[in-house]
Amino acid sequence: MENTLEKKWVEDIEYLKEELKKRHNNLFAYTAEESFNEKIENLKSMVNDLDYEEMKVEISRVVASLKDAHTSLIFPAKRFIPLKFYYFNEGVYIINTCKGYEKLLFKKVLALGDMKIEEVLEELSNIISFENEYFFKAQSMKYMQIAEVLYGLLIIDNMDKIKITLDEGEYEVSTCSFEDLVYTNERLPMYAKNDSENLWFEVLESGELYIKYNSCREQGEESIGKKIENILCLIEKKNIEKVTVDLRNNLGGDSTLFTPLIDYLKNSEKINKKENLKVIIGRETFSSALLNAYTFKNSTNAKIIGEPSGGKPNCYGEILRLTLPNSKLVITYSTRFYKLIEDDLVMALYPEEVLLESIEDYINL
């Protein structure tokens, strides 16, 4: 084989196989090594027949077959559908739009290209790394927005314009760059506001303190530690007795950043009561945010409400990255096993009170 594109892809695939085996904490915890090796060899034999977008999808398929939600291809994407999707119990709906597509807001999605939405989701389930259905519901909506993913899966044949069938008609949508992905609907549920801020808080009219924790990562000049100090000062100053901590959209980072707040709430006699302290979890509560949720569950009297978590309690995590030498595609992989509970078959943290949002709830919030 000459130094061709084919040879470079084969080198990358072989590198992926060998390096994951070397570096991952326990690569074959959920799938057989023979099955993985077979998928690798199959992919090598296909390189001549696949274009770049299809190769990305097929590498993602191999990595997703390991069934470790922390081990995945970071999908390089340049073209996006200018619509934000959400997977409700009633189906997939558009919950936000970019300029020019406002009339599609809150419509139900029936098909992309010529493929029914149920089949699109089935295709996506084979290339996304997830451990439970709740995380898939979250991740699939992000992948569904990426034109390169849909093209690589042969769902569409044009990455610039995409046909989308809604419950009241068919539309052609032009894709856009990430920079142009600016949503226009400002009538959002409170939890969906300030979604780019790692930690924010607000005293509600009822006097309850609402704390939204979106990311266990530092951001900007004000540290999470400083923000927590401000929260504690506010609680003392206003003599707050009821607190809701919302972790529903937190995909993780460093679980220790939130410890000072959890410790304070744990030691507060007036707040640390089931009727006064609530923690909201959901399909995007994952990794370090799930560790925080379990700390609340195990060391406070908080009532856990919301949807089951996207993260599995016992899981592999603490990710590092490897870069394929030729294509420069990046794959995350797990370096540590977290055992939070005895029963490894429990797939999520299940709330005491399940709150499943319908499209009507979302519109009327």
Question: For each predicted feature, which ranges?
Answer:
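Flexible, low-complexity junctional segments that flank or bridge functional domains
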Residues: 1-242
